[in-house]
């Protein structure tokens, strides 16, 4: 089974989590492709998306992921053959905590993509080991693939 991991990061935290999940999935026998800021053309044939994103500014997607989701929002295609899950990193001191993860989920569901498990929201204020926290959530994602 092939998994496309998309990371959107401003300061590197989401990128580190995405890379860690990529390594764990490969160790477990999955085929993966890791993209830091892909275009829609890069991933148009991918059917399983694991999106790992931080929230930037006032609840925005990071600059390296925003163009993809802007393009998706405007695209008229049906993405019902795409299954996805989202990992969001944010700071609960802000009222826009993990808004980027919510936006990703909203755009994908509007395009009929199928959410396979609950979104993981990591509060960087309270979770020191974000990679380990995401790894502990990973069985939920894998179960959703079945």
Kindly give the residue locations of the regions a language model identified.
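FMN-binding flavodoxin-like domain, especially the glycine-rich phosphate-binding loop
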Residues: 7, 12-19, 23-24, 28-31, ...
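Extreme N-terminal starter segment of soluble prokaryotic enzymes
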Residues: 1-4
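A short beta-strand-loop structural module common to alpha/beta enzyme folds
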Residues: 29-39
């Amino acid at each position: 089974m092939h998994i496309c991991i998309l990371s959107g990061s401003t300061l590197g935290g989401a990128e580190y989590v995405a890379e860690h999940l990529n390594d764990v999935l490969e160790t477990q026998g999955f085929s993966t492709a890791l993209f830091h800021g892909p275009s829609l053309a890069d991933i148009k044939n991918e059917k399983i998306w694991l999106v790992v994103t931080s929230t930037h500014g006032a609840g925005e997607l990071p600059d390296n992921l925003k163009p993809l989701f802007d393009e998706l929002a405007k695209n008229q295609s049906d993405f019902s053959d795409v299954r996805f899950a989202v990992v969001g990193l944010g700071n609960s001191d802000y009222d826009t905590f993990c808004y980027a993860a919510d936006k990703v989920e909203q755009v994908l569901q509007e395009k009929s993509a199928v959410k396979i498990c609950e979104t993981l929201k990591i509060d960087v204020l309270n979770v020191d080991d974000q990679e380990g926290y995401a790894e502990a959530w990973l069985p939920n994602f894998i179960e959703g693939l079945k």
